[in-house]
Amino acid sequence: MVLNFIRGGPVTGRFAPTPSGRMHIGNVYAMLGAWLSARSRGDRMLMRIEDVDKPRVVAGADQLMMDDLHWLGLDWDGEPMFQSQRTERYEYALECLRSQGVLYPCFCSRADIRAASAPNEGDGFMVYPGTCRRLLHDHPDEVRARLVRGDQHSIRIAMPESAAGEKQRTVPDDSAALSGAVPPEQQGDAGIVDGVACFNDRVYSPQHYDLAREVGDSVIRRADGLFGYQLVVVVDDLDMGVDDIVRGRDLLRSTALQMWIRQCLLAGGFEPECGNTEKPLAEHPEYAHLPLIDNAAGRRLAKRERSLDMGALRARNVTPEQIIGYCAWLLRLQPTPIPCKPADLLADFSWEPLRANHLDRALKPDDPTTPQWLAEALG
């Protein structure tokens, strides 16, 4: 398969909520950003329900989230995609990666990894120390014996080494040749060169991650058999033709990893079920990562904070326009959080105000910019 990778033309954005509970203000803020990014250019917006992690799924949460989005005035095109219905596609993707020789079994428990690694400040991303990669390199017979014995294991994807990397590649394949072939300036501001993933984020400007040192070999199939988030979102975005991704800045590092997975999939012959036939598939999507929204204590908003979820706010008779107006203010699209509709923001939408001021924000009841309805919800 030959793919032409270009920029320009219509784009496809997506909502990708996890049905683990009711949406809160922080979720709506991200959803509004994604919707405006696509709709301001007259482009497609799709819906994906990320329900692959079955233990986290709350029954009925998907319908509540879609109802809340309709109530807010945030629409999408076509029918929703459900990850729970796509196991065959993920199995196929796994085989494409396996053909590239970039996968290996990992027998480490979470406790083992926590003991050997330290999370990165800011996003909590934990770089795997490569224990089982070294085991495969130094003692392949032991690995084979453990697999035959049926020892529980996850599957990891190996990262390419940077030019400065000193670790020996332990997965016997030629996939290192996948990286570094095309300079970033020829890849639409995004690419992987000498084991370094580069992309020009529309909010946080150019980003560079050494995949081996700053990302590390990552799980794409868990020990319990469930497919990993990092794999399924790449497969889904390829199949949906998504090339406009908006999400929180805590996923900046994950973007580098997903670029590598995407590149390996396409090199392994992955054939996307792309519904967007108006232009050829982009090699890498465009990205906008948003500042995080914290609670008054400085911790990131979570769905367990029920006073700020959509059910609680709607029960307080807060209007859609009040919520959208506040989220527009969080996106730096208006100087004060005055009520408005999503459509009111389309004509003047730009990432430039947020790019110029992308500090995280905390929701505080005593802040003079906090509207009364939100101050009351914050207690």
Swiss-Prot record:
GO CC field: cytosol
Chain location of the short sequence motif 'KMSKS' region per the record: 300-304
Motif 'HIGH' region in this chain: 17-27
Any one GO BP annotation for this protein: glutamyl-tRNA aminoacylation
Binding-site positions, Zn(2+): 106, 108, 128, 132
Essential cofactor(s): Zn(2+)
The organism of origin for this protein: Bifidobacterium longum (strain NCC 2705)
Note describing how the cofactor binds: Binds 1 zinc ion per subunit.
Annotated binding of L-glutamate, by residue: 14-18, 50, 229, 247
Homology family: Belongs to the class-I aminoacyl-tRNA synthetase family. GluQ subfamily.
Documented EC number(s): 6.1.1.-
UniProt entry keywords in alphabetical sequence: Aminoacyl-tRNA synthetase, ATP-binding, Ligase, Metal-binding, Nucleotide-binding, Zinc
Span of the signal peptide: none
Renumbered residue ranges of the record's region Disordered: 161-188
Name this polypeptide is given: Glutamyl-Q tRNA(Asp) synthetase
Role noted for this protein: Catalyzes the tRNA-independent activation of glutamate in presence of ATP and the subsequent transfer of glutamate onto a tRNA(Asp). Glutamate is transferred on the 2-amino-5-(4,5-dihydroxy-2-cyclopenten-1-yl) moiety of the queuosine in the wobble position of the QUC anticodon.
Residues reported to bind ATP: 303
One function term, GO molecular function aspect: metal ion binding
